[in-house]
Amino acid sequence: PVVRGNFVWKNGEQDTEVLFDPDPKGRFRVSWMPPTEIRNISKQENSKRVAPNAELGVGGVDSYDLDATVDGRGSKGAFHLYNKFHMEYPSNTFVLEYASRPPLARIFYEDVLKAAFFYGYPVLIENNKYGIARYFESRGYDGYLMDRPAHLSTTKSNVKTKGIPSNSQDVIQSHAHAIESYIHNHVGVNRETGDMGIMYFNRTLEDWIGYKIDNRTKFDLTISSGLALLAAQKAKPKTKPSDFSEKVFLRRFNGR
């Protein structure tokens, strides 16, 4: 059910309507799209565009600030959209995956913006890479960027900042715990209920398998998927986060 393609503005006119253009070499992989009636909704609060479908889903972005021609490294921009629990639509599942390194960072930023607008989902970023935040603000879409979730705040102050710090040990552990919990509950067969979890994006699964918490740089899809899961959390998990320093999410099996 996964389709590759790109999101484009209708007739090339920004801020109108986003369309999905199927392309076997497209940068996006998509397993589900919202019904036509809730796509491309332009909603404003206090004269600012905001995400209209935040109760349905959220996104996570592992961004970069330097153009590929300047940086030259292999790290990609990664992006996931995730559906929360819902009675009508696919629930507790990733519906979009993106891992690409366009030559200009702003192409990546605009890709994220178009998909977020099409779905109407807010996205959570790492605030140590602020290029994407500045871009969204310049385009009038900073209302689509989530503030730091309250349950991930280390202070009791009401200071609101876009995104979360990637160098915080509390955030790093919460991020890893969110992925481990998701895999346990929603990937493969749930031994307690017998239900089969659905995860359509093999590149993300492979990224989870190889993930090393002490060397997170190479695992772009793990970072963005974990940010989406953190964005979907309503409150701080009651279970104490595990120590992931010597842990893998998925065990490797040599047998076929």
Positions of predicted regions on the chain:
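RNase H-like, metal-dependent nuclease domains and their acidic two-metal-ion catalytic environment used
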Residues: P1-R148, N185-R256
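Short alpha-helix plus adjacent loop in nuclease-associated cores
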Residues: L145-V189
